[in-house]
Amino acid sequence: MTDMPDATAPTPAIDSDHPAVVGFAAKHASSGRDPRERAVQLYYAVRDGIRYDPYSLVMTVPGLRASTTLEKGRAWCIPKAVLLAACCRAQGIPARLGFADVRNHLSTERLRRFMKTDVFYWHGYTSIRLGGRWIKATPAFNIELCEKLRIKPLDFDGRQDSIYHPFDLEGRRHMEYLRFHDEYDDVPVDEIMATFSKYYAGMVDQPLAGDFDADVEREAAAVEPAPRPSPRR
């Protein structure tokens, strides 16, 4: 694990001192009585206030900044994790970034063709220091997306790790965690870029064009609900 003497300080990507970040954090954590309650409030504000959009991938520090995500209102998993970490730090709650390689069984056809794999390398989450422990929080998928794709929304109570479920609400494979990386005080851009260049040829240089929300609507419409057992007579 990387040495992080102060997980509450701003960094180039986790710009927790930016006025927009400070204001967003103060607005959404205003009623929290302690760090745990404030962290939970911030989790839901980021999860549902910023729409998940993997087509918006930009692997530069300016593109990953928390303030940039607030300006755009949509982002993929890493900048959403960055935003949650920045909001926590703005509230004096220690937070850092964690990463895992996952096999994601639920994505759009356009994304699958573009990536040429169902493995998402360096999937981002936020690790928050609460009650003397580092707890994982994954604010990536907003509630509307979960409802459309029949995914159980990830809740966060500030006590237990919040990571993706292996199956969706229809019993289909959803997410498999293949490997957990280290946790970091800022985005390890060079390490992530090296992996992306190896496995996602051309994806970083030519961002994916398309409307993610529209693609999700089409995917959701094409999914047939799983058969329900017949009632006993």
PLM segments and residue spans:
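Active-site neighborhood of thiol-dependent amide/isopeptide-bond enzymes
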Residues: 54-122
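Secondary-structure boundary elements
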Residues: 2-72
